[in-house]
Design a protein with these regions (language model features):
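Short, basic/hydrophobic alpha-helical segments
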Residues: 76-95
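Mobile genetic element proteins and their domesticated derivatives, centered on retroelements
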Residues: 15-17, 58, 64, 83, ...
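C-terminal domain-tail junction helix/linker
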Residues: 160-203
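Extended, low-complexity cationic-aromatic segments
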Residues: 1-81, 189, 193-196
Length: 203
């Protein structure tokens, strides 16, 4: 994972992934409070339906800033639109995109698009190794911020929640560092060792 630990000089490393599909609720809105006084929260549905929404996300490892895009489908066209946003957000240098080897990421259409955008290069993660993608960690934070405990009536509400959560997370973003951080040095208290010496008492 040299792109994480020692990226090429002047380059930008982006971890990219898609979250979803997410669909709005398929039931009438429930009352805000239950009979015993507890707040009612319906879990967000992850399923396939006519109004499903995919969330494209890209994490800039160097400073923790993220770019997101909501789309009604996961295909080459929307992936290229997402890459265009990344290119606009990173106007200088080579952009390394670390992502999974999905068909839309390496389709004929996407490869042709990349020929016209030579600054963007792919580094594909091996199959069954999604844990190598630091975007997965950002998704966990995003789900708690934007989706957990919320109901959405339509895709527009999902897009709005995504936009707000992304802005809030970017406001407090920090660099993402690959691997475990080194433990802090321990501070030891001074140890005072008292040695008792026996004295021979002359009688």
């Amino acid at each position: 994972m040299e792109l994480y630990t020692a990226p090429p000089p002047g380059s930008t490393v982006i971890c990219a992934d898609e979250l979803g599909p997410v669909i709005p609720r398929t039931f009438p809105p429930a009352p805000g409070w239950s009979g015993d006084g507890h707040r009612i929260k319906e879990p967000l549905e992850y399923s396939r339906g006519p109004e499903k929404t995919w969330v494209y996300g890209g994490l800039r490892v160097a400073d923790g800033q993220a770019v997101t895009l909501c789309a009604p489908s996961r295909n080459s066209a929307f992936y290229q639109e997402f890459l265009q946003l990344e290119e606009q957000a990173n106007p200088e240098g080579t952009i390394w995109v670390i992502t999974g080897n999905l068909s839309s990421h390496d389709s004929k259409s996407t490869r042709a698009w990349l020929e016209d955008h030579p600054r963007i290069r792919h580094a594909f993660i091996p199959m069954r190794a999604c844990w190598l993608n630091m975007q997965e960690g950002w998704w966990r934070i995003f789900r708690r911020q934007a989706l957990a405990g919320h109901e959405f009536a339509d895709p527009d509400e999902i897009a709005h929640a995504t936009q707000v959560a992304t802005a809030q997370l970017n406001a407090r973003a920090r660099p993402w560092i690959w691997g475990r951080p080194q433990p802090k040095p321990r501070s030891y208290r001074r140890r005072f060792i008292y040695t008792l010496k026996e004295r021979s008492i002359k009688q």
